[in-house]
């Protein structure tokens, strides 16, 4: 795995600093924007925030992250699901002013941890995150989302719907076909084409509210929420304590996504540009989101999945996606058009995106020749997978470690405390 910023991955169609041609650039960037759109706007819709502000926050957050990480990490920032529960609670009591302080505090926590890591270094990362830990965690990142993908693909108002599932399978089929059968631009944007195909099928079946699209105004300025301007600022320690601790949970998810990107791009981003910069980028993105009325943001697995499928890792494509997201926040009709995207379309494409992430975890262990016949490795992998995919959680008061975060912590602890060989394996060796 290279730590040299001049390294070029010839296995990628476009490596991190390669710039695509204009038409391909637009198509590839739109593909990333469409892939993250559903998840990014569902968070504010559930909480009662503005989807347009969330979209703008994701775009500006991505640009800030790319700038802070010196254009070395192709990551997209979208609305984080980890904060939904506390934000819902605060919306009922303090309204957005309390949520804003909580989101800003999340960014500050990230920046404090980034400063500590900058001071003490990150050599410890290799010790606590060997392939036997990284592989299963990456698999959990993909597989823990499988239930969500299946629900979107099959369920309508809590009941199984065959039409939905057929649309999901058609969306998946179109993406797979375009990826396998075509070269050139079409072969580079299978996810986008799958989404468009599924959308058109849904439209033909009457699942898209065309009237809402028709009556929507073309342009609309998002109702940004600025502290001291849109609402009076008053420090709320209760709101900060409610949201800020969850930053430690999302940090583990952040590190998991960086692990996936390390394997995907054959680099070590923990070393270059450094874990301190990746955390600082995430922190600044959330801090800015809180100051303009958006939810906390985090790196998105959907966009990592797109990169795996297309082998396009260009940071410029992510920059384009961020710019499109910021523009779409003001183009209300296009915003409404995408918000009308049926769930089975999202579910169908998610089968592919989340599946590719999971299989990359398997590839991590294969590449490092991890021996699962060794009891130590088997115990770590098995425990991590079931806890993570089963979404087990540890709750202490209002503080909760769920799924991926808990699995990551347990995997790290097991790796640090378990001996290299079980007693029975030592006996076998002595006999031999």
What residues fall within each predicted segment?
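N-terminal signal-anchor module of multipass membrane proteins
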Residues: 1-77, 82-95
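Intrinsically disordered, low-complexity non-transmembrane regions of multi-pass membrane transporters
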Residues: 1-27, 210-228, 263-270, 277, ...
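Short, non-helical or kinked segments that cap or interrupt transmembrane helices
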Residues: 49-55, 71-83, 125-134, 186-192, ...
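Hydrophobic, membrane-embedded alpha-helices of multi-pass small-molecule transporters
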Residues: 23-36, 162-171, 189, 221, ...
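Interfacial segments of multi-pass membrane proteins
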Residues: 87-92, 179, 303-318, 324-328
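Membrane-embedded alpha-helical modules
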Residues: 93-211, 320-429
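Membrane-embedded helical hairpins/re-entrant loop segments and their flanking transmembrane helices
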Residues: 8-23, 45-66, 242-315, 429-431
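Juxtamembrane interface elements at the cytosolic ends of transmembrane helices
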Residues: 9, 37-41, 171-181, 189, ...
